[in-house]
């Protein structure tokens, strides 16, 4: 016997509630949820629109970054909805604010394709940042579970193997970015590489926007750089290198340049963050297959990482890039010309260098996390640093870092080689003093160590006279929520 329309409607209503329902009532908020070891966890800084309850805003973010749309859909009945819904399980007010909240959200691991950063980010940051229920939204931190991490390759080389290849231990590595970064001919570019390496640097590097322009095509640059590397290595007896930028318009062209770099003897190439997550992972797989180091310039990151209330915190980018498989990434200097709160920078470096992360709120680390045996990623400090800051750089950044003095090498009045020598002597003098127990970070002691070293090194004395104690101390935009730091109160 056929059922009446009213009877069918009654049965449907018993099984399924249609229409627009608050996200919190649809299962995207669960204060009693027990976090599972296999969950992907995300911490968002939420600024709800006026009149929007913080819990509802958190649930909305959870819903829109997982399975929800604006209305209930009957096809929910065809899925394991309870399992696949992301669950906001905790909302805390952000210290020292009146309209911001930390929302903790758990995602079932099966929501994400294995080993695909593009798929992970398509959910976590794909749609929710334009959602009307929130006035601003920032992804502050993530916990990637062991099971999901193991589907990513991580850095192919890592810090330990890179040091073995260079035969350099117990101190930062030294580098410089060729300046001016645009306009040099290939021959002059190669000369800069040679002079810097011969003067004592371990690396020179292409900058983010030197690719293949009319004034210097990529093949010309690669050949002259390798000539400079080989001559400097022969003259010094040290392993040297220069990061060759293979960033291009298509992956076909990226691979073409990468293959050529390998063929002529390069050991390291560089790509830019603006290439995109799929391109970065593809380049990392190529680097692993070809036994090459992969350096990542974070070009473009501050368009979404710098503002405190909206975007993506750079510590999350650090996690994603370590998962993707880059060996180096620019991660801040504290004392240079670019954004860099000391506690935030230390948090970035911990994310890249530690095997296990513990909750450290002053550093902005909200989750315990094991790196599941993925290799460590070498942080790079670059942008407005010079040898007179060596005591500060070593104190803040430690040993496992590449210190890149671009202008601080090439801007030396006596030439590029002299600038490189000044940096090398300053580094070795400071490391030696530290190892002997000196209070090198003391503002009276550190500069004096450099002055003593300069008595036997003319290039260092010239550099100290030129740049003195210049630093770029501005109030940081992105500061710790749970501690005050010096640059936040300049």
Swiss-Prot record:
Per its record, how is this protein called by name? Answer: Ribulose bisphosphate carboxylase large chain
Gene this chain is encoded by: rbcL
Q: Which residues bind Mg(2+)?
A: 205, 207-208
**What SUPFAM superfamilies does this protein's entry cite?**
RuBisCo, C-terminal domain, RuBisCO, large subunit, small (N-terminal) domain
EC numbers: 4.1.1.39
Which amino acid positions bind substrate, per UniProt? 127, 177, 181, 298, 330, 382
**Per the entry, which co-factors are needed?**
Mg(2+)
Superkingdom field: Eukaryota
Q: Where are the residues marked Transition state stabilizer as a site? A: 337
């Amino acid at each position: 016997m056929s059922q009446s329309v009213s009877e069918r409607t009654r049965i449907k209503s018993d099984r399924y509630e249609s229409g627009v329902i608050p996200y919190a009532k649809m299962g995207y908020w669960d204060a009693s949820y027990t976090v599972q070891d296999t969950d992907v966890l995300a911490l968002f800084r939420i600024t709800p629109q006026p009149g929007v309850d913080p819990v509802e805003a958190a649930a909305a973010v959870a819903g829109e970054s997982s399975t929800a749309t604006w209305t209930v859909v009957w096809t929910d009945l065809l899925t394991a909805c309870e399992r696949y819904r992301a669950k906001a399980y905790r909302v805390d007010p952000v210290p020292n604010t009146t309209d911001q909240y930390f929302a903790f959200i758990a995602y079932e691991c099966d929501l994400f394709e294995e080993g695909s950063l593009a798929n992970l980010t398509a959910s976590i940051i794909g749609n929710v940042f334009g959602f009307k229920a929130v006035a601003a939204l920032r992804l502050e931190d993530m916990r990637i579970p062991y099971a999901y991490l193991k589907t990513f390759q991580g850095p192919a080389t890592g810090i330990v193997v890179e040091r073995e290849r260079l035969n350099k231990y117990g101190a930062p590595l030294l580098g410089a970015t060729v300046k001016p970064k645009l306009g040099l001919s290939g021959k002059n570019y190669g000369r800069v590489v040679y002079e810097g390496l011969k003067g004592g640097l371990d690396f020179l590097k292409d900058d983010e926007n030197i690719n293949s322009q009319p004034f210097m095509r990529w093949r010309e640059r690669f050949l002259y750089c390798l000539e400079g590397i080989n001559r400097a290595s022969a003259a010094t007896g040290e392993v040297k290198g220069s990061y060759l930028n293979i960033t291009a318009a298509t992956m076909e062209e990226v691979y073409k340049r990468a293959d050529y770099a390998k063929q002529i003897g390069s050991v390291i190439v560089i790509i830019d963050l603006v290439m995109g997550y799929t391109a970065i992972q593809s380049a990392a797989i190529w680097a692993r297959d070809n036994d090459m180091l992969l350096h990542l310039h974070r070009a473009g990151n501050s368009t979404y990482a710098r503002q405190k209330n909206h975007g993506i915190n750079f510590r999350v980018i650090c996690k994603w890039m370590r998962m993707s498989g880059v060996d180096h990434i620019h991660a801040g200097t504290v004392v240079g010309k670019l954004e860099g709160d000391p506690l935030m920078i230390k948090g970035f470096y911990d994310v890249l260098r530690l095997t296990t992360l513990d909750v450290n709120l002053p550093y902005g680390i909200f989750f315990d996390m094991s790196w599941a045996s993925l290799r460590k990623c070498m942080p790079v400090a670059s942008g407005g640093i010079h040898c007179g800051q060596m005591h500060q750089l070593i104190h803040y950044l430690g040993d496992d870092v590449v210190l890149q003095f671009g202008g601080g090498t090439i801007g030396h009045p006596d030439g590029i080689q002299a600038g490189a020598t000044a940096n090398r002597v300053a580094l070795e003098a400071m490391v030696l003093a530290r190892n002997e127990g000196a209070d090198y970070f003391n503002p009276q002691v550190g500069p004096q160590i450099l002055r003593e070293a300069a008595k036997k090194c003319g290039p260092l004395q010239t550099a100290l006279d030129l740049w003195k104690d210049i630093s770029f101390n501005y109030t940081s935009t992105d500061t710790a929520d749970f501690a005050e730091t010096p640059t936040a109160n300049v």
